Amino acid sequence: MLKRILITNDDGFDSPGLLALKEALCDVAHLTVVAPANEKSACGHGLTLTSPLRFIKLDDDVYKLRDGTPTDCIYLALNALYEEHSKPDLIISGINLGSNMGEDITYSGTASGAMEGVIHGIPSVAFSQLLHDKNTFGFDFALAKKVVRELTLKILSGGFPLGDRKFLNVNIPYVGIEEFKGYKVTEMGYRLYGNDAHLHRNPRGEEHYWLGLHPLAWNERNNARESDFKVATEGYVSITPIKLDLTSYEDIKELEAWI
């Protein structure tokens, strides 16, 4: 019996990254796709509570969710499309158009799709493809499809390597298969941000802002393990284990003394 995989993303149902993901796994498992009807990049772990959501069926087991976030997609798919006794064996979010590394994970709708999956007790992986920009014309996703397929088969055959409420965050380098150097397990790097609020004026002189993306810059955390940024920009696939518990345990005793 085929395993069941639930797929979402944050770039929208018509993203070439989502198409590449489906192509990589179409013969590996039974796929159900529930993706946002519109791009939801950087929406974070947002759940829609103030407006109704509607599935729009595009094909057998393929849906777009009108006004939905990746978190909505996973939440509703698990609670409205799947029977209690037939939940998916794996949830995959991606393939994101661009990296999700360091503190960018907290903004990422792609990472949040996987985050929602593990909240519901289902092994989950977020895949992101490093790009120079979002213009994917002519980009074949060959390495990304290879990586997705290899890691998915490994999980389905050998089990998920992490415990409860932990997911895998995978970043794929912007290189061809022949330049691919292999896999490395990494920690989150220290993302550097700047002022990317861009002021514009319309023809009537009214001001508005666009928020841009800061160039990919980071610091290492001075630990023994390399960061996701360093590894992925050197031609390796970065695999980072992410846990939902954000407690700063090393600060508890000092905080107790402070109060």
UniProtKB/Swiss-Prot annotation:
Its cofactor is a divalent metal cation. It catalyses: a ribonucleoside 5'-phosphate + H2O = a ribonucleoside + phosphate. Its EC number is 3.1.3.5. Its main location: cytoplasm. Keywords: Cytoplasm, Hydrolase, Metal-binding, Nucleotide-binding. The keyword Lipid metabolism does not apply. It is an enzyme of class 3 (hydrolase). It is found in: Cytoplasm. Belongs to the SurE nucleotidase family. This is 5'-nucleotidase SurE.
